[in-house]
Amino acid sequence: GISVIVDAVFNHTGRDFFVFLDIQQNGWNSKYKDWYKNIRFDGKSPYGDNFSYEGWAGCMDLVKLNVDNNEVKQHIFGAVEKWITEFEIDGLRLDAADVLTGSFMEELHNFCYSKKQDFWLMGEVVHGDYNNWAKSGRLDSVTNYELYKGMWSSFNDKNFFEVAYSLNRQFGDGGIYKYAPLYNFLDNHDVNRIASVVKDSKFLIPLYAMLFTVPGVPSIYYGSEWGIRGMRNNYGDYEL
C-alpha cells in the first residue's frame, strides 16, 4: 500500500497568515502577539510594520513561530488531528526540524502517536548531530545530508574517500549513527536534480545501487527514476 506523509511547516508562517495580519491591525492589543518569536513594538520591521519580529534564517518573509507557546501548539496539534481523522495521513515530514525545539518535537511525537500508533515522523535536518533529533520520543528519521554530498561528489571526482569516510563515520563499527534510521537521498525539492549534478549519466545506476544498499531509508525524488534534469537558479527552483 501507499502511505501518505504530509510536508508540515511548523517553524514559520508567511506574512499573509491570519495571525500576522491580526498583529498588523491590532498591534500590542492583538491576542496573537505571543505567537511569534521576538515580537517587539518599539521599532519597525524592514517592511515598515509598526513592530519587529524574527524571520527564519534572516528571511523576513518567513515569520518564525514561537512553537513552545501553548496556543501555537494547540493550533498545530489541531491541524494534525484533522489531517489524521479526515484524511488518514500516516506521517509528517517536518520542514526545518533542526530549528524546532526538542520539547516541541517531544510533545508533537506524543500527540501523534496517541492518535495513530504507527505514525511516522521524519525531519529535515541539514546541520548538526542527527542523534539529537532521530531518537526515541522525537523523530523516527531525519534527512542524511552528509551522505548525500559524499555520494555524488565521490563519483564526479572519481575519488571515493569522501563517501567511504562518511559511511564509516556514520555506520561503521564505531559509527555515530549506527542505529539511527536516516533518510537517504540523491536529490529532493531543495537541491539540484542528481541527473544534472553528475558529470556523466553512467554514474546514475551505481549511485542508485549505493543508495539502496547503504544503511537507512532510501528515497527517490519524483521523476528522478526517469533521469529528469533540473537546476536551481537566481530566479527560483521551478525546474526541480
Q: Model-derived features: where do they sit?
A:
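Short loop/turn motifs at secondary-structure junctions
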Residues: F87-E88, F185
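Loop/turn elements at helix/coil->beta-strand transitions in domains of secreted/extracellular proteins
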Residues: I2-I5, E88-G91, K116-W120, A180, ...
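The substrate-binding groove and active-site-proximal loops of carbohydrate-active enzymes
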Residues: R15, G58-K73, D90-V99, Y148-K158, ...
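Conserved interdomain hinge at the start of the Helicase C-terminal
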Residues: L204-P206
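Substrate-binding/active-site clefts of carbohydrate-active enzymes
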Residues: G1-E81, E86, L108-S114, N131
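Substrate-binding cleft of secreted/luminal carbohydrate-active enzymes
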Residues: Y208-R229
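Catalytic grooves of carbohydrate-active enzymes
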Residues: I84, N188-D190
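Active-site-proximal helices and loops of the catalytic beta/alpha 8
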Residues: F20, Q24-G27, A79-E81, T85, ...
